[in-house]
């Protein structure tokens, strides 16, 4: 029996909900999700539905952040917190601050309409551990109303050691710490001040205290079996080379994942780095650094989430769920989320088979080169996005070593109102520099021609296929080997 497609076009409509239920019924019993070979089953069970901790999960599951923690105890040179901003896509920004009660109401509304939702996080817009009373109250109330949702926090780590035991008691089993240095001499270039022990600290003293508290918190989390992801901002000329040492240190202290993110530096954001002209890294610089890191598993699918982000990574739906749109009284209905999970279990089983076949194909090539391939996707692990509608492209390296996600390239949407913008296309061509081939479900003649002139081949030939199946078949065609039988896509 063929696998039903995961529909996403009418995401909040009754038709979509009904289709999910019908699809879930049609697939019957679902096979269990299998842990990858490099992850133990216990860890896999915790991360398999968390879109930030599992690259595979981000194709299928959504996260939600609630902006209940505006207070912060450090100042970073790359941060300018904003609490009523709808236009910027970066950490520390939210459209509206919430009380714990408002947050619970919003979480129920989202859970009822977004069946992909699996995780609730508190990531500010300040610091979740420093603004602890609001964080704790929110988690306690959400856990009572929606007991099957996973809880996680993001923190700078300064106040983390004070609350690790409480996090464990509340079954918070995923924590992200932003660690940009393990040498206070580097830290003084990133943090003007911290607030700790009832007073403000500056200079080397501030960086030293922050470092010591971050390391203590990381060790305490590891001792209690709480999974930790470390975020690091790559700041060219400040900590880029130093992040190699950061990677080694955080692995030794128990971090599961390391996510190296590019500095977002724009004057209009009002950050110190933005106003002083500190540049962010180019895409190739970020990838080159990531490729040099050894130790923890790397997260390469980060989206720089806002403090009020909602939805699949790369598809923020926060604007659909403002407080004004949510009823004062609302009851949780688990049926959509339960049906969706049944559907996804079957889809993931088929996807895993296709992924393994594709990797066997490319690794069987005796003489083959390396390809850098961009993919337009809107979820489900498939090539299912029109070139003109894409706001980002997933980038994969394909070689005899296998198929690996290398990162993503952000772009402006080319096609608006049915027409493409020439200036936007020029920027897309620049953003895709170094890419050999682009895969999408549809592309117009003009953008295809412009990409070809820039040395980039675009093709619709693998539309709606699993990404890895398409990459394997494409690699086989490029290097003259027999590809596996094509996996059914509908």
UniProtKB/Swiss-Prot annotation:
[4Fe-4S] cluster 1 binds at residues 72, 76, 79. CDD domains: NifB, Radical_SAM. Binds 3 [4Fe-4S] clusters per monomer. One cluster is coordinated with 3 cysteines and an exchangeable S-adenosyl-L-methionine. The two others probably act as substrate. The keyword Lyase applies. Its EC number is 4.-.-.-. It is an enzyme of class 4 (lyase). Keywords: 4Fe-4S, Iron, Iron-sulfur, Lyase, Metal-binding, Nitrogen fixation, Plasmid, S-adenosyl-L-methionine. [4Fe-4S] cluster 2 binds at residues 302, 305. The keyword Lyase applies. S-adenosyl-L-methionine binds at residues 78, 126, 178. Residues 58-308 form the Radical SAM core domain. Its cofactor is [4Fe-4S] cluster. NCBIfam families: nifB. Involved in the biosynthesis of the iron-molybdenum cofactor (FeMo-co or M-cluster) found in the dinitrogenase enzyme of the nitrogenase complex in nitrogen-fixing microorganisms. NifB catalyzes the crucial step of radical SAM-dependent carbide insertion that occurs concomitant with the insertion of a 9th sulfur and the rearrangement/coupling of two [4Fe-4S] clusters into a [8Fe-9S-C] cluster, the precursor to the M-cluster. This is FeMo cofactor biosynthesis protein NifB.
């Amino acid at each position: 029996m063929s696998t039903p497609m995961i529909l996403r076009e009418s995401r909040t409509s009754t038709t979509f909900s009904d289709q999910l239920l019908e699809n879930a019924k049609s697939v019957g019993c679902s096979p269990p999700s299998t842990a990858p070979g490099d992850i133990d089953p216990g860890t896999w069970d915790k991360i398999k539905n968390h879109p930030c901790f599992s690259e595979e999960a981000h194709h299928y599951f959504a996260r939600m952040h609630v902006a209940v923690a505006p207070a912060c105890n450090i100042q970073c040179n790359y941060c300018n917190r904003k609490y009523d901003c709808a236009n910027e896509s970066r950490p520390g920004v939210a459209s509206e601050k919430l009380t714990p009660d408002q947050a619970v109401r919003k979480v129920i509304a989202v859970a009822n309409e977004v069946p992909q939702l699996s995780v609730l996080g508190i990531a500010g817009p300040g610091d979740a551990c420093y603004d602890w009373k609001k964080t704790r109250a929110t988690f306690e109330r959400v856990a009572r109303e929606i007991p099957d949702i996973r809880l996680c926090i993001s923190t700078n780590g300064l106040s983390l050691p004070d609350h690790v035991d409480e996090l464990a008691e509340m079954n918070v089993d995923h924590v992200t710490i932003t660690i940009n240095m393990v040498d206070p001499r580097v830290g003084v270039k990133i943090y003007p001040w911290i607030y700790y022990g009832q007073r403000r600290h500056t200079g080397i003293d501030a960086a030293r205290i922050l470092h010591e508290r971050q390391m203590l918190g990381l060790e305490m989390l590891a001792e209690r079996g709480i999974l930790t992801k470390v975020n690091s901002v790559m700041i060219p000329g400040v900590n880029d080379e130093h992040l190699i040492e950061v990677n080694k240190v955080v692995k030794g202290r128990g971090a599961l994942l390391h996510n190296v993110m590019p500095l977002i530096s724009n004057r209009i954001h009002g950050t110190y780095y933005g106003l002083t002209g500190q540049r962010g890294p180019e895409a190739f610089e970020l990838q080159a650094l990531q490729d040099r890191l050894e130790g923890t598993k790397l997260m390469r699918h980060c989206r720089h989430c806002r403090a009020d982000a909602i939805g699949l990574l790369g598809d923020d739906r926060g604007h659909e769920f403002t407080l004004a749109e949510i009823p004062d009284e609302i009851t949780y209905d688990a049926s959509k989320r339960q049906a969706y999970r049944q559907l996804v279990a079957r889809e993931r089983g088929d996807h895993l088979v296709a992924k393994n076949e594709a990797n066997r194909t490319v690794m069987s090539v005796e003489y083959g080169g390396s390809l850098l391939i961009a993919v337009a996707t809107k979820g489900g692990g498939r090539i299912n996005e029109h070139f003109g509608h894409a706001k980002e492209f997933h980038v994969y390296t394909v070689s005899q070593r296998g198929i690996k996600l290398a990162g993503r390239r952000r772009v402006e949407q080319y096609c608006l109102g049915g027409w493409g913008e020439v200036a936007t296309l020029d920027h897309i061509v620049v953003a895709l520099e170094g890419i050999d081939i682009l895969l999408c479900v549809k592309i117009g003649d003009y953008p295809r021609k412009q990409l070809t002139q820039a040395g980039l081949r675009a093709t619709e030939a693998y539309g709606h296929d699993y990404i890895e199946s398409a990459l394997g078949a494409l690699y086989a065609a490029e290097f003259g080997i027999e590809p596996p039988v094509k996996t059914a896509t509908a």
